[in-house]
Amino acid sequence: SGAVIQDIGDGILNLEFQSKMNTIGADVLTAINKAIDLAETNHPGLVIGNQGANFSVGANIGMIFMMAVEQEYDELNYAIKYFQDTMMRMRYSSIPTIAAPHGMALGGGCEISLHADKVVAAAETYMGLVEFGVGVIPGGGGSKEMALRASDLFHKGDVQLNVLQEHFLTCLLY
């Protein structure tokens, strides 16, 4: 399997990815769901972390590429939906979820962190939604979570426009 679930003390579960480069595939998503099932029945919380060089370099892009090339669109849509459903389940589970990223937390690894209730990141953590670099949009809900977290910082009545948006609007109005 791509992940191991273990009790790390005080009944807290830890989910440790063990796939190559801690990539996220169906086996890891199944393990996340299993860990949530276990934690919600008998444990006070879930930590997602590992001792590898990197937290996770994201989805298995090779698998996604092959599905697209072979025009297996139903399987590709199912894989994306399974990832999204798993992230939403993690976000709204009845137990606290903690992500402990370190090293690289890219793409899906970043999205897992964004859906956790708490993130305890190592000082040298390189995190981001890098999907645009390979020509795709983040599929696990990371863009939504990033926008929601940013909006939590706004105060009632604030107008939040970055410089690019402001210049773009100026060009359109004149």
Question: Model segments located where?
Answer:
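A structural preference for short, pocket-lining loop segments at secondary-structure junctions
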Residues: D10-E16, L29-D74, Q84-A100, A122-Y126
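Conserved small/polar residues in nucleotide/adenosyl-binding loops
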Residues: Y174
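CoA-thioester-processing core
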Residues: L106-F168
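Short beta-strand/loop segment at the start of cytosolic alpha/beta domains
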Residues: S1-S19
